[in-house]
């Protein structure tokens, strides 16, 4: 067989694999710097996407308060505009607000202008609600292309993904979701042998419309928060997670 006929498809396959890795794999740095871990194994960054959600977010805030847990909320701009009081409450209770675009599109298929518009509109919504824009950004579905991280950087935002995505958006019972957060406990038990900690990505809202039942997420967190605390984990915002703790 002509070696060219072999080489061309092979090169195309390798190229496709590289793009897939860059776009989908949370730890990939190919398209630019992405935060995907905390700087200390004793830290756990709790992050919540797709809110604010009047049906769930207030209950979540109360739960976090019980454990003196600070978290990062990656909010959708159009929901921020509908829920300005709730957005202000998130910030007032010590949590960090971050950018999750205006409408939650798949940015992988968009060009730089559309990507920039999505990010800027969410920044404007946050500016209007709480008086300042976000410093951190998470792309919807975690998908990136060459313009996503560079555009976020132009808007003075760092891009954040995760170490654990347990799939709480799926229509599964809490008994299915809870064990999928077990890796955090296992990592905490091995903290002495690790030099970084976990970023958990779960959801307090649903991106298609305002609201959504995320009670399974609350149920799983009710189980895990006291156990993670007892393992010595400190619940931190992303801003705290990227700075080395004082000794």
For each of these PLM feature ranges, what is it?
Residues 1-24:
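Hydrophobic alpha-helical topogenic segments used for membrane insertion/localization
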Residues 23-114, 118, 125, 132-134, ...:
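Active-site beta->alpha N-cap acidic-glycine motif
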Residues 48-50, 73-77, 99-101, 139-141, ...:
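A cross-domain feature marking catalytic cores of carbohydrate-active enzymes
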Residues 59-62, 85-92, 117, 121-124, ...:
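Alpha-helical scaffolding segments of alpha/beta enzyme cores, especially the outer helices
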Residues 105-110, 168-172, 207-211:
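A short acidic, helix-capping loop that chelates divalent metal ions and anchors anionic groups
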Residues 110-117, 176-179, 212-220:
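Alpha-helix N-cap and loop-to-helix initiation/capping positions
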Residues 143, 149-193, 233-244:
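His/Asp/Glu-enriched short active-site or ligand-binding loop at hydrolase and phosphoryl-transfer sites
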Residues 185-239:
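Catalytic grooves of carbohydrate-active enzymes
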